[in-house]
Amino acid sequence: MVRNNNRRRQRTQRIVTTTTQTAPVPQQNVPKQPRRRRNRARRNRRQGRAMNMGALTRLSQPGLAFLKCAFAPPDFNTDPGKGIPDRFEGKVVTRKDVLNQSINFTANRDTFILIAPTPGVAYWVADVPAGTFPISTTTFNAVNFPGFNSMFGNAAASRSDQVSSFRYASMNVGIYPTSNLMQFAGSITVWKCPVKLSNVQFPVATTPATSALVHTLVGLDGVLAVGPDNFSESFIKGVFSQSVCNEPDFEFSDILEGIQTLPPANVTVATSGQPFNLAAGAEAVSGIVGWGNMDTIVIRVSAPTGAVNSAILKTWACLEYRPNPNAMLYQFGHDSPPCDEVALQEYRTVARSLPVAVIAAQNASMWERVKSIIKSSLAMASNVPGPIGIAASGLSGLSALFEGFGF
């Protein structure tokens, strides 16, 4: 029997599908459009660099040195700079006075320290019973900066032989405790008050009685109470504070002669209206040579019974003097720096941003805080159209180079 081993071939069926879609047309070699590059950001960066470089030629280095002198501590910078870059044009002598001194605070007493805008005088000090304020019998005594006599002479009648007027850029003070941690006690309180020098016609206690135009201080009542804006902390933490010019302009004040006390001799405290006395001591050592346009810093250190409180008191001030033509200092003078509106605006911005005082440990980072305020302010100002924005952008570029300039 023959088997049929032939397999049937299975025929493959083709399935044809009909569609209405058109077949894709082969693309021709069409050149592609170039990719758009984001030139706007790059253009802005180029413009920013151009503005910064352009501002480098217009903004003066004295403007930056002015900010550094006003706000940097003396252990960081002792350069007095070229002066205040405002619209004043004339010959000036710049000076940065610095005093470091050890001080002991009497137990069961409150010690008051006044950092006042008095050229050549570092601070005024007096102590009163604990828990009280100065009264009419209290006398604040002067402690001088080094070099007082070289600037203002040894006689009260020759204070203006070298310089005729002055103005402040800033005043600073720091108290750095050195007490044993097991022996200290007490607190530090800081506030500020505006004190001004005034000329008033007063009766003079002479025989026969007469009257005279004498100098007196107004605003000292602010020392007799802690202001609403104040700083209070434990003594061991210390304090750092500074005062700047709050007036619209940096105006010069005259150098005064023949004044050793306020109120003057033969004028009583009750007659003058002052709540207490200020005495500079012997005229060969010190004197009251003027009063600038700065808020006075008031520091009260309270030391209870049994406390052993000691500290290093450091105070410094940046001033600008107008030298007399026939004085030796005239040869060391220089022209006042050109006006730098942006630097002056940043001075005001920093002044508004700083607190009344901080603990002493934060003084080391104070210049870093000032730089951050300047950079933040200039970043906002650089968006302003016109020359102000251009100048701000340029100074912002300079502020980024502070480290390179030693700032």
UniProtKB/Swiss-Prot annotation:
InterPro entries named in the record: Peptidase_A6, Viral_coat
Chain residues that bind Ca(2+) 1: 161
UniProt protein name: Capsid protein alpha
GO term, biological process aspect, one: proteolysis
EC top class, as a word: hydrolase
UniProt-annotated site: Cleavage, residues: 363-364
Residue ranges, compositional bias (Basic residues): 1-12, 33-48
